[in-house]
UniProtKB/Swiss-Prot annotation:
The gene is glpK. It catalyses: glycerol + ATP = sn-glycerol 3-phosphate + ADP + H(+). One of its GO terms (cellular component) is cytosol. This is Glycerol kinase. Belongs to the FGGY kinase family. NCBIfam families: glycerol_kin (TIGR01311), PRK00047.1 (NF000756). It holds the Pfam family FGGY_C. PANTHER family: GLYCEROL KINASE, SUGAR KINASE. Pathway: Polyol metabolism; glycerol degradation via glycerol kinase pathway; sn-glycerol 3-phosphate from glycerol: step 1/1. Key enzyme in the regulation of glycerol uptake and metabolism. Catalyzes the phosphorylation of glycerol to yield sn-glycerol 3-phosphate. GO terms for biological process: glycerol catabolic process; glycerol metabolic process; glycerol-3-phosphate metabolic process. Disulfide bonds: none annotated. Inhibited by fructose 1,6-bisphosphate (FBP).
């Protein structure tokens, strides 16, 4: 009998590093997690220590193997998934970062973005990278490091510095500096990668004064990039065989590999991705065009929309409004009333994301009457997550011309049955909740396992993607449209607040 083999997924997130071990049936055998330091040098700036990212990630790998009693020679391959856009620049001779990692949330490069807009590059960037000009993405962060760290620009010109998103940094460290690589999904979040030619965009690199020599080689999301020796000296060499940015890994983990398949991750915010296959769809409705994974981990296209306030709006009910003791109680209180009684909550606390992109909108509660109680507000806040999701899905359908047949869901809020049912009702499509909700890690593991032949193909994996529950839509069409029109009116109120202020 052959000895059992496993796949390891390294899930490097914004607040913690995790390692997940899966067996051949795609069951999770062991998980280990370590949080790391969030650094806020000044308002709007967010950093991580790249060495701490690597230290926490490598220690979770060792811990999770020890916890499960699995030897390193039983690992068939390692897959990596990571927080996207976060930017690291290091010296390839010393292996030391020249500055902290600048995190995706960091807004310090807003001025550089304004200059790109003034230079008339907005349309070029949208057409060739699929993105909007925003400090969120890596390109302007690289420029900031080269412009502000002493000696960095000279070293970069001399070919001594390397750039990487978190996946690139981890692979470089795990292969002792032998491999400088990223995958298409992570490259597509830098704002300097051309998604038409699948090459670094030399015009944008020149505009931002970034030497091409710094940039990693870009490969598919499922192939052997290099090997790592996790047992130390004389230990086993294990192939690193899968890489994908966290949202694209979740899309793959949900088996959304064909045109028109979509998933929504309900976290602090919501991330919706729809696979558009080989067809690049340029959004006219405020969505991003990005790269995802095709059936074999090759580059395919996707539309992406982000909702800023998902689970965070429930935390607001708990922490600021004191209407809940525990976020999990929201379902119980929401079902204590038959409807939201005409109340709408628009949680635009930091403006509105896709498809509105309105930084000046503010949180609003409308439709209050004397009969409104706390349960109506709790229910309306949960409903707002579903309405915002519909806003993005409608934009995706308009851009792609593809009618959604079902929505696959993951993330913390999917445990809320009321929200999932209301989501199905609002969209008029079935909502599928998987049994294993660790879909980001699953995606990275699937990509690595397929690359080394651990799994035969997608057909074999599809049989392992068990749905825990499907929520079928119940509302009649008149009621659905009436409620959604009410939501649209409420959004207009949230957007009008700043306009009214300007008129004073």
């Amino acid at each position: 009998m052959t000895e059992q083999k496993y796949i390891v997924a390294l899930d490097q997130g914004t607040t913690s590093s995790r390692a997940v071990i899966l067996d051949h049936d795609a069951n999770i055998v062991s998980v280990s997690q370590r949080e790391f330091t969030q650094i806020y040098p000044q308002a709007g700036w967010v950093e991580h220590d790249p060495l701490e990212i690597y230290a926490t990630q490598s220690s979770t790998l060792v811990e999770t193997l020890a916890k499960a009693g699995i030897r390193s020679d039983q690992i068939a391959a390692i897959g990596i998934t990571n927080q996207r856009e976060t930017t690291i620049v290091w010296n390839k001779e010393t292996g030391k970062p020249v500055y902290n990692a600048i995190v995706w949330q960091c807004r310090r490069t807003a001025d550089t973005c304004e200059k790109l807009k003034e230079a008339g590059l907005e349309e070029y960037i949208r057409e060739n990278t699929g993105l909007v000009v925003d400090p969120y993405f890596s390109g302007t962060k690289i420029k900031w490091i080269l412009d502000n760290v002493e000696g960095a620009r000279e070293d970069a010109e001399a070919g001594k510095l390397l750039f990487g998103t978190v996946d690139t940094w981890l692979v470089w460290k795990m292969t002792q500096g032998r491999v400088h690589v990223t995958d298409y999904t992570n490259a597509s979040r830098t704002m300097v990668f051309n998604i038409n030619t699948l090459q670094w965009d030399e015009k944008l690199l020149k505009e931002l004064d970034i030497p091409l020599s710094m940039m990693p080689e870009v490969k598919s999301s499922s192939e052997v990039y290099g090997e790592t020796n996790i047992g130390g000296k004389g230990g086993t060499r294990i192939p690193i065989a899968g890489i994908a940015g966290d949202q694209q890994a979740a899309l793959y983990g949900q088996m959304c590999v064909e045109q028109g398949q979509a998933k929504n991750t309900y976290g602090t915010g919501c991330f919706l991705l729809m696979n558009t296959g080989k067809e690049k769809v340029t959004s006219r409705n405020g969505l991003l065009t990005t790269l995802a994974c095709g059936p074999r981990g090759e580059a395919s296209y996707a539309l992406e929309g982000a909702v800023f306030m998902g689970g965070a709006s429930i935390q607001w009910l708990r922490d600021e409004m004191k209407l809940l003791a525990d976020a999990k109680d929201s379902e119980y209180f929401a079902t204590k009333v038959d409807s939201s009684n005409g109340v709408y909550v628009v949680p635009a606390f930091t403006g509105l994301g896709a498809p509105y992109w309105d930084a000046y909108a503010r949180g609003t509660i409308v439709g209050l009457t004397r009969g409104c109680g706390s349960n109506h507000i709790i229910r309306a806040t949960l409903e707002s997550i579903a309405y915002q999701t519909r806003d993005v899905i409608d934009a995706m359908q308009a851009d792609s011309g593809i009618k959604l047949s079902a929505l696959r869901v993951d993330g913390g809020a999917v445990a809320n049955n009321f929200l999932m049912q209301f989501q199905a009702d609002v969209l008029d499509v079935a909502v599928h909740r998987p049994q294993v909700t660790e879909v980001t890690a699953l995606g990275a593991a699937y990509l690595a396992g397929l690359a080394v032949g651990f799994w035969g193909g997608l057909d074999e994996l599809a049989g392992k993607a068990v749905i825990d529950r499907s929520f079928e839509p119940h509302h009649d069409e008149i009621k659905r449209n009436q409620r959604y029109r009410g939501w649209k009116r409420a959004v207009k109120c949230a957007q009008s607040w700043a306009e009214l202020h300007d008129e004073e």
